[in-house]
Amino acid sequence: MEKKRALLTVSFGTAAEEARREEIGGVEEALRRRVPELPFARAYTSPTIRRILAQRGTAVPSLEEALEEQLSAGVEQLYLLPTHLLPGYEYDAIAATVESFRPRFRDLRLAPPLMGDTDMVRALAGVLMERWRRLLGQAVVLVGHGTAHPGNLVYPALQGALSLAGRGDILVGTVEGWPGPEELLPVLERQGAERVILAPLLLTAGTHAREDIAGPGPESWKSRLEAAGLTVHPVLEGLGRLPQVQELYVRRLEQLLEE
């Protein structure tokens, strides 16, 4: 008798409706198109986001709740795909939860985060180089979340992949990790950049993008760059909106199916 299978995505989540629909939803839809025969479910890890959405009438389960629901539905083989970009504390918590549930499934498979290996870092660099064309006097600054976790190393790894490909005009920074504006401003000066395209290196263009990256506050990336005399053009576009990034998540799913 064939095992009952299903696909579960797990995201941090966002309360921004457009980002939830176009960016998280864009990734989810690409995955569903790849395996239309599998029942699909989603989970959000942020209690705050789940509470806000519940107040609006949209219930999204936690990972633990979603796993219990899959067990109740009789699922034996579950493919779990996180939309997280890097192997940080959030991903570690997901992995720990999965391990605690593993004995209760016949086959429970967890995909790595998007930038969980060198091949995917290089693939994402290729997508970014295609998205952001080189223009004289212009630099592109992409800002990720950042973390104190060793997984923060994926940001300089991505920068290395871009630089080795000859695209040193695309710079990678973080909100809460390294490098920050103080590290990137001297690089922009050496490059002679006059204009900066400022965009999030995040799945969704939510609160971090609108406040910490492109917000009006004095400590935002936009304000710090403008204070240095640069002309800044924010582009509030989450990575999940890009079809090429959606395809990278599909590649992660295909790896999971082949295990």
Over which residues does each language-model region extend?
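Active-site-proximal alpha-helix that buttresses catalytic centers in soluble enzyme cores
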Residues: 1-259
